[in-house]
Amino acid sequence: MLITNPALLGILASLVPLALGAPNQPIQARSRKCVIPSSYASSHGTADDSPAVASAFAQCAENSVIVFQEGVDYNIFHPIKATNLSNVEIRVLGNLHLPQDITAVQNIVKSGQSTWFTFQGPRVDWTGADDIKNGWINSYGQAWWDANPANSSSFPNRPHLMSYKTSQASIKNFRSRKPIAWNVKLQGDDITVSHAIVDATSTGGFPFNTDGFDVEGTNISITDSVMFNGDDAIAVNTPSHNIVFARNTIGYQSHGMSIGSLGKDPTDFANITNLRFEDVTVIDALYAARFKSWSGGRGLVKNVVWKNIRTFNVTFPIFVTQSYSDQSASRSGTIDPFSSVMMEDFTWSDFSGTINTYHPGDGSCVTDPCWYNVGLPNLKHTEAIVLECNTESSCKNFRTEGIRLHPQSKDSPSVICMKATAELNPKLGFECKNGTFVPH
């Protein structure tokens, strides 16, 4: 079953009163303020406010506060790029609207402007409205999803919503409604994200590639947020260290809390350590906890914990593959099938909930077999755990404990396990073989 919009709104409303935490103290006062004017109302929603927005970011690029006015609508018909920011607060108290003309947006992307908002610089804070009716970026992605050709996962020339590269910064009350595709590429150091909302629920076509946060950096936390989408809620990419994803609710047709994909380019050495995913509710998703790397990849991912994860109607609650495939991507060059992105010190602890037995999978399947079933023998959709290690030495010190996952059919939970050897994984918690899940 899928969560309806009223249910989603209930979850969103429940998060508003939660404490946001103390903001970072700026090194220097933000003594200048740029309040952005809007022509939306006077033009009956037809005028482009992008020039006024660009002007504000140019005038207030340092030690400033840039304000989208409370309850005011803004048309952002052209991409905004501000890469020279320093000690700036972006205060989004109104609502932003991307163009609804698909062809116009595609032409902009084809011209080389692939990201709609690009922000870069130290201490760049995003502060959305406390009022849940405001602070939204409206991308009108539903029309894009519905226009996607049958049996295709890649509608051409879709923009990324936002690239955000900063340090010593916070993002609070970020809200994205119907993103066309990817939401936020987040890069940097010492960044806290809290009370974010991504609503990519669809009434028609599947919302392909609507990732919540694609993360690359150090000391980054994402907490107290809701993401209902059609791809990873969070995807941790290389290099990344000390990442926390906690107290969040994710779902719709989500691809869960993911690491990767890694190793597609075997010359790109993966380097990821110290990740913690904790106290997360996962609803109606394809995956909950996922690791994905390509065979032939290189590198190391170490010290990863998923803990206290609650699943409701999830197809693959725990999923590891070191032989990932992407139905919309191809590889070039020589691939060594015995090379892997090494995994070491992984823990899955205190998982509880239900496995989607009756209607497994999601709308991202456009191939036969479905991309997410490739290489899995005799799927029953009672699998609590799927571990696909590429070689007998590529998975080390895996640990499971407190796994209480149950198929909706009330059959016994099962496991698919390949090459996670007992010698390298003495605390795995079950025998690595395909069949009924029997915890030790």
Swiss-Prot record:
Disulfide bonds join C389-C395. It catalyses: [(1->4)-alpha-D-galacturonosyl](n) + H2O = alpha-D-galacturonate + [(1->4)-alpha-D-galacturonosyl](n-1). Glycans are attached at N84, N151, N219, N271, N313, N434. GO terms for biological process: cell wall organization; pectin catabolic process. It is an enzyme of class 3 (hydrolase). It comes from Aspergillus fumigatus (strain ATCC MYA-4609 / CBS 101355 / FGSC A1100 / Af293). The active site is at D231 (proton donor), H255. Belongs to the glycosyl hydrolase 28 family. Its EC number is 3.2.1.67. One of its GO terms (molecular function) is galacturan 1,4-alpha-galacturonidase activity. This is Probable exopolygalacturonase C. It is found in: Secreted. Specific in hydrolyzing the terminal glycosidic bond of polygalacturonic acid and oligogalacturonates. Residues 1-21 form the signal peptide. GO terms for cellular component: extracellular region. Transmembrane segments: none annotated.
